[in-house]
Amino acid sequence: MNISGGLARSGMEVRGATIAVSGGSVGGDFVALFGSEVNITGGQIGPFANIIDSVVNLSGGRFGDASQTTGNSVINVSGGVLGDVFGLSLGSGGEANFSGGIIHDLSAGSGTSVTITGGEFLLDGQPVVGLNTPGDSAAVNFSVAEDLVGVLA
């Protein structure tokens, strides 16, 4: 399914399908189920999206505020905007990979994997320990009161 303009209804659900959003808008409460692939290069998917055992690739446009993943879902962000205020809640078994774009908020519970590729990472204004040369990686645990900032690759 290709969406390049106009408005798709709220509550739209896809199962095991590929959807490409290059313009226009998909209303709130969008659901991608069981092996679906959602490719967003422009346009937007409204708030409260629910991604279940599926993949979202965001390289442009906007992906819904207050959205969540369940099961073995994967979120790949190389551009665009993820969330506005409440961002994304990554459920157990989920994976998120960030190499670009803007991430407003991310909640990642136990059993999740988050990879952020870039440089100049600071945690509450201090350099992240262990990131001294290109290719270094570090496991970082921080609270909701702390900010992680950096330049995404």
Set out the residue ranges of the language-model regions.
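The right-handed parallel beta-helix/beta-solenoid scaffold, focusing on the short coil/turn
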Residues: 1, 6, 10, 17-19, ...
